[in-house]
Design a protein with these regions (language model features):
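Conserved hydrophobic helix-helix packing surfaces used for dimerization/oligomerization
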Residues: 25-26
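Acidic/glycine-enriched connector segments
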Residues: 22, 34-38, 42-209
Length: 211
């Protein structure tokens, strides 16, 4: 067996795998008790699934806190892409779920803050979808927005999903640059009847602001 040849082959394989790994990390903030902006719940869930699939396909690594009504469909999208294409799921998705009990009597709010900080500091981009709970906007999403802005992430509120995402859009759009407004309009000024077109426009808008 030629050891030098094997080492060279292994190096090429490792280099190839390295080049295939995602180059951008995107934090997706979202939760949903209801799915505003879509004609039915199925389309909204398909939108989340397709968005995650296409982000992975375009070499983005998704970071998510597994918010209700959102996290499950992001997971399914990334998983489908990775298993179809023989990719490692861990290279394309990080799930950082929030603790749901206080059995140790730790300060649960403090743990939530630290969890949000750790998720956001890993990322270059923050996208915001839906954000509603019991007919009110999600305070957790607003906290994530402020953290992401503080840390200088590129912000993408998807306002047609309503809730906190719309609230964040209204805060960010009016006084922003023309290029940011162009990207926001590309994302949000479209019918939600065509899920694939929606996702295509979101990817184009992200690339527009990453130039």
């Amino acid at each position: 067996m030629n050891t030098k040849t094997n080492k060279k082959t292994n190096y090429k394989t490792e280099k190839s795998e390295c080049l295939e790994k995602p180059i951008k990390r995107i934090f997706i903030s979202g939760s949903a008790d209801k799915y505003d902006g879509f004609k039915n719940e199925k389309d909204a869930k398909l939108f989340l699934h397709t968005l995650a699939y296409k982000l992975a396909e375009n070499n983005y690594h998704i970071v998510n806190g597994y918010g209700k009504g959102v996290g499950d469909f992001l997971l399914s999208g990334v998983t489908e892409y990775c298993l179809k294409n023989n990719k490692q799921i861990s290279n394309y998705l990080t799930i950082m779920s929030f603790p749901q009990n206080n059995i140790s009597k730790a300060n649960i709010e403090e743990l939530y803050i630290k969890n949000r900080e750790q998720m956001i500091e890993k990322c270059d981009i923050a996208a915001f979808v839906f954000g509603n709970k019991n007919n009110t906007n999600s305070e957790g999403m607003i906290q994530e927005y402020h953290l992401a802005k503080q840390k200088g992430l590129t912000l993408f509120p998807i306002s047609f999903t309503g809730g906190s995402a719309k609230q964040i859009f209204d805060l960010e759009y009016p006084n922003n640059t023309e290029i940011v407004k162009k990207a926001f309009n590309l994302i949000n000024n479209n019918s939600t009847d065509d899920v694939n077109k929606l996702v295509e426009n979101i990817l184009e808008a992200i690339k527009l602001l990453q130039i």
